[in-house]
A protein has these predicted regions:
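Short helix- or helix-capping micro-motifs
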Residues: 1-10
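Helix-loop "lid/cap" segments that line or gate small-molecule binding pockets
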Residues: 5-6, 57, 61, 78-84
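Short, glycine/polar-rich helix-capping loops at beta-to-alpha or helix-loop-helix junctions
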Residues: 10-16
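C-terminal long alpha-helix characteristic of the crotonase
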Residues: 14, 23-74, 104-107
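Terminal peptide-recognition signature
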Residues: 17, 54, 96
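Structural motif
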Residues: 20-21, 99
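Interdomain hinge/lid region at the active-site interface
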Residues: 85-89, 95
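Terminal low-complexity tails and localization/encapsulation signals of metabolic enzymes
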Residues: 94-107
């Protein structure tokens, strides 16, 4: 389906994009603020280091020619090394094991 859309420049609406799997969630005008607030709240629950790292690694991976190269490049990315060395990288599994909410430090 993606190739057909690319070659024909066919546009799709939000509902069709959702059915195809590249739109995460759809809301009408009346529900948009609640959807955005819910999404933001979910993002804010995560470690700031993890969010920064995830964004950087997606960009790194997308610049690669294939999945194997993307995985290799991501593991060599300075953002990945910084995350692995962070206190937050240890706090997440520790909080999970202790059945408590993590206390992110942001480093």
């Amino acid at each position: 389906q993606a190739m057909g859309m690319i070659l024909s420049s066919r546009r799709v609406g939000a509902d069709e994009g959702y059915r195809m799997g590249f739109v995460t969630e759809v809301a009408g005008v009346e529900g948009l603020d609640a959807l955005v607030a819910r999404f933001a709240a979910d993002v804010l629950k995560a470690s700031p280091v993890s969010i920064r790292t995830s964004k950087a690694l997606v960009v790194t991976g997308l610049a690669q020619p294939d999945m194997a190269a993307a995985m290799l490049a991501q593991h060599g990315d300075p953002a990945f090394a910084a995350w692995m060395a962070s206190e937050d990288a240890r706090e997440g599994p520790r909080a999970f094991a202790e059945k408590r909410s993590p206390q992110w430090k942001g480093y």
